[in-house]
């Protein structure tokens, strides 16, 4: 059997039709997801019940035949495994107990202690490795340290990550220690996902764009480099996708600086610019505006084709610039796939 298309792209091969998957492809836009989510009772129960987490991971594969399935979990399971309280408020999102001092960082569990909490996630990966179609690539993931830290410091998502920036300004050494602890735990977490059957892993740095200058180097580039180097040492041949969202011009050179096999792009950068400045270093992933899966129409088709064409001279995985939204029309996803695959 020939190698899976996404693995070929991640090795630098240019394919006539780009492989495709979507961030948050298992999500509320799908009626079957909503039914399974109701069966679970709450979001965390869905994440920690392997049969149900595997089921929602498989649903978009059955419906659309995406080239990859991404593990259904949440980036905030890791801080919970490090000892923080985690709960979800209906209509508002996640809440965490907070880490705002050197003492708070010191009180976190060591990286080696995360696996008891996260063992259901690894079981989900094992189920998926058995049940996915043979041609479908299984992607594991974690939040990148900066993004995870923003939630651990603020106790919730914030529009400007101000609490994390304040902690960083007040006690840079303590904040760096927090980043180090998350980095160590992320290495062990992704390594365990790979051991359970993940064929690719992705680092989501959703708030990388709020880091500037030296901070971007210290808290986005360097942790990613450490994580990728450690994973490559433990698991040679396992590709890593990095997503420093809203990095803008810093997308250029990110693969070289971190060792990532692929850089995922948000839709704030033009595909033509990224093809010239980012794709020269290897595979790129992206970058359709998810809002087009809500509005649909000819603009969805033409923009999908434009992105495919822009990246056609090098290795490319088609994806969105951010996660698909609950308001997206499932029929528009089918239209997008038709525009890509013909």
Curated annotation (Swiss-Prot):
Presence of keyword Ligase: no
Alphabetical UniProt keywords: Cytoplasm, Decarboxylase, Lyase, Porphyrin biosynthesis
Enzyme category, top tier: lyase
Recorded catalytic activity of this chain's protein: uroporphyrinogen III + 4 H(+) = coproporphyrinogen III + 4 CO2
InterPro entries: UROD/MetE-like_sf, Uroporphyrinogen_deCO2ase_HemE, Uroporphyrinogen_deCOase
Residues annotated as site: Transition state stabilizer: 74
A Pfam family recorded for this sequence: URO-D
E.C. number: 4.1.1.37
One of the GO BP terms on file: protoporphyrinogen IX biosynthetic process from glutamate
Localization (cell): Cytoplasm
GO cellular component, as recorded: cytosol
Assembly and interaction partners: Homodimer.
NCBIfam families: hemE
Function text: Catalyzes the decarboxylation of four acetate groups of uroporphyrinogen-III to yield coproporphyrinogen-III.
Name recorded for this polypeptide: Uroporphyrinogen decarboxylase
Organism name: Paracoccus denitrificans (strain Pd 1222)
Taxonomic path: Bacteria, Pseudomonadati, Pseudomonadota, Alphaproteobacteria, Rhodobacterales
